From Swiss-Prot:
Single GO MF descriptor: structural molecule activity
Keyword flag Disulfide bond: yes
GO cellular component: host cell nucleus; T=7 icosahedral viral capsid
Entry remark concerning the domains of this protein: A DNA-binding domain overlapping a bipartite nuclear localization signal is present in the N-terminal region of the protein and is required for efficient virus formation.
Subunit relationships: Homomultimer; disulfide-linked. The virus capsid is composed of 72 icosahedral units, each one composed of five disulfide-linked copies of VP1. Interacts with minor capsid proteins VP2 and VP3.
Motif (Bipartite nuclear localization signal): 5-16
Localisation per UniProt entry: Virion; Host nucleus
Protein name listed in UniProt: Major capsid protein VP1
Entry keyword annotation includes Ion transport: no
Major site of localization recorded for this protein: virion
Family membership: Belongs to the polyomaviruses coat protein VP1 family.
SUPFAM superfamilies found in the cross-reference section: Group I dsDNA viruses
Length: 365
């Protein structure tokens, strides 16, 4: 029979446990805080938001919506306007410069460790009044149709711009090259409707890359983490969660997060929440903004650039940019002299260095 031994020593009065250690907040403020230099072991958290780019301009009364969707009656005669197309939103944050000497063997770089994000304005999807199509045919009776339909939610955090792949439903669609960025018409073919590895790009501008024909490139983006979901359907109810307790880890399988090149952080987002249906059955895409909170730390890395390349870049960039005729196809002959030799018997002799570094002499025919 076992016995339970009781601790007969009562706890001493006045002794308490120590508080749990948490990160020490030393600076808090707006964008001006980014200019301050902090210690080597400090972390930085940046809060920002990206507004949607659904097609309507920032001055329009329908900002946050696309223009009316116009289904085409013919594949060869489609009337597509660029305001119908939701696009990706892009934000770039300039981080504090960490290195005063770029010639050192070891450098400090900002590394994105984790982020918190959510779609802001989910509450607006509960609006069931106003100038929208109603379920009841009687005027002024019954609720209006809420936002419903296609849901596309995407965000990316990286140390450089998001690398993207062009793929579309119909390569004959008349995209406007001046208002949106798409490959030239002469490069589009039926291969554009599947994966054409020649149609790649970099998302370097806000509000000009249409969502329907650009997607993140899975074969690249080693320095970017992206996340996305899609729910199709014309009348699909939006399903969105919002909380400030979920943290997304940005580290890869080696424990390394996106390294911010040139001390810049790139945020990309697109959030399509469905269609707004008007009384005349016209439909517009509805987009919502996205909030981001990104935590960064300082990471020691090996300097990937030798001093020679840095100096070469410095001298090259000091020259003014010029636009000239294309010389690659107009240069007829190049001669390089080095040292001396005996007088050759053929003044038109052609010699060159092959790709293996060996000297070759062409025998005349």
């Amino acid at each position: 029979m076992s016995r339970m031994r009781k601790n007969m020593n009562p706890p001493k009065k006045g002794l308490k446990g120590q508080p749990s250690p948490v990160p020490k907040l030393i600076i808090k403020g707006g964008i001006e805080v980014l200019g301050l230099r902090t210690g080597p072991d400090s972390t930085t958290t940046i809060e920002l938001f990206l507004n949607p780019r659904m097609g309507q301009s920032t001055e329009s009364e329908y900002y946050g919506f696309s223009d009316n969707q116009r289904g085409s009656t013919s594949r060869t005669d489609e009337d597509l306007i660029s305001a119908e197309l939701p696009r990706y939103s892009l934000g770039v944050v300039q981080l504090p410069l960490l290195n005063e000497k770029l010639t050192d063997d070891v450098l400090l770089m900002w590394e994105a460790v984790s982020c918190k994000t959510e779609v802001v304005g989910v509450n607006t999807l509960t609006t069931c009044h106003g100038y929208k199509k109603r379920y009841s045919p009687s005027a002024g009776q019954g609720s209006a149709m809420p936002i419903e339909g296609i849901n596309y939610h995407f965000f990316a955090v990286g140390g450089e711009p998001l690398e993207i792949q062009f793929i579309c439903e119909d390569f004959k669609a008349p995209y406007h090259p001046t208002e949106t960025i798409v490959p030239p018409k002469d490069k589009l073919s039926n291969k554009s409707q599947v994966l054409d590895p020649t149609l790649k790009g970099i998302l370097d501008k806000d509000g000009v890359y249409p969502v329907e024909c650009w997607c993140p490139d899975p074969s690249k983006n080693e320095n970017t983490r992206y996340f996305g979901t899609y729910t199709g359907g014309v009348s699909t109810p939006p399903v969105l969660q919002f909380t400030n307790t979920v943290t997304t880890i940005l580290l890869d399988e080696n424990g390394v997060g996106p390294l911010c090149k040139a001390d810049k952080l790139y945020i990309t987002a697109a959030d399509i929440c469905g269609f707004l249906t008007q009384p005349n059955d016209q439909q517009q895409f509805r987009g919502l903004p996205r909030y981001m909170s990104v935590t960064l730390r300082k990471r020691l890395v090996k300097n990937p650039y030798p001093i020679a390349s840095i100096l070469t870049s410095l001298f090259t960039n000091s020259l003014p940019p010029v636009t000239s005729q294309e010389m690659d196809k107009q240069v007829e002959e190049v001669r390089i002299y080095q040292g001396v030799e005996g007088l050759p018997g053929d003044p038109d002799m052609v010699r060159y260095i092959n790709k293996f570094g060996q000297e070759e002499t062409c025998i005349p025919k």
